[in-house]
Amino acid sequence: MKPNNLSFWMQSLDMSPYSASSDPALLLPSYQCDVAIIGGGFSGLWLAYYLKLAQPETKIALFEAQHIGYGASGRNGGWLSSNIPSVINNLLKHPSITPAQIQLLQRQVINTIDVVDDVCQQEQIDCDLHKGGLLFIATNEAQIERLQHYHESELAYGFAEHELNMLSAAESQQHINIPSMVAALHYQHGARIHPAKLALGLRERLLGMGVAIFENTPVRAFSKNHLDLGKSTVQADKILCCTEGYSDQILHNRKIIPVNSSIIMTKPLPESFWQRFGWQNNELLGDVAHLYIYAQKTRDNRILFGGRGAPYQYNSVDAGVGQLDGNTTQQLYQRLGELFPDTVFEIDRAWKGSLGVTRDWNPSVSYSAEQGLGFIYGFGGNGVGPTNLAARTIVDKICGRYTELTALPWNDYQCPTWEPEPFRWLGIQSMYKMLAAADKLEYGLKLKKSAFFAGTAYKICGLD
């Protein structure tokens, strides 16, 4: 059975040791477990993994509406990254959150890259993980100013000086020979992965540990100790909701909305391409345009290239199976060609996915022992690493342990709600139109600073 998801990652699993097909576990009309986890993405998978390690006798069941890795965890850019700028910037606005807490969060996110790598080695999960670092590039002077600001902010809130380097054009092109690049910020910490291999590898390990996994089993509603599956009911001492961009379908509280990100994947590129453009260290690649791109060089010498495209659908409609429109595909192809000129790329696959965004772009990790209810959500497209950290955090909370993780500023964080429609749609569409105009103005007029109205656009949707 092919996965109901159009991403290259999921569709390529037939060529890997993992299989996206599954035989759902038998679910009786009434089922009982100690812990029920809703959502089969990275948050739910990591949570089941660490909880089973901490409490081997606990009966854990994971419920997924589609198949493991159906959502963003099987569609993302494969960035196991140390970079969480929007989270840091927005947490700084809260007087109750100290700089020391923010620095601790950043250090934990950095350390999580090694944590994930260690688990993959211990559990023999081959997910193409390669630690090549991260390169954010600038292609005009306004973007150089933003890179310098990022550099200063990162050093102030958690990064050590040796972990970051501002690079000139010549220094940058020693990493990747992009002709239009005028500067770059290089991060020592960053790794590319094949996200679907990680998700399905975790699934395989969880089954071996005795975790029950129910795929194609949507949860319609839940309350204390009770899950409603339509034809079945589940009684559980603890219920943990890990549904990210799909959360509003079950929570109906406007805390989180699905924002789409779009990706194209090239066919494998010849050695002559890599001799010309470099990229020998396999760095993650991004830029600091307002409508930014992200990319990776895959193990088999493809380029994954992503951006926002059509970011938000009215009334929080999610990305479905990931069918990407031709206009967005063409926009991404054009931008790819601008960075790597005089190259004809063959596109193997194009898709989109829904990431989860809160009103202030801050994630939240919460657990109430009294209610037996927990929630992980709001990574805003930066969840490949932080979901692992969030899972370890909530396991500490469940086990009653007071640790560095339970002191992180996202613990029990209360996100504001999004506006109702049509105001939500109007605001998001306005933001993206203004950011597109800001990029165009910065290039066209060769501005030395960010376009003045870009800040207004960020404020509209809580990014500034």
Annotate each PLM feature:
Residues K397-M431:
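Active-site-proximal substrate-binding core of FAD-dependent oxidoreductases
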Residues K2-N4, S16, S86-K93, D118-G132, ...:
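Flavin (FAD/FMN) cofactor-binding and adjacent substrate-gating region
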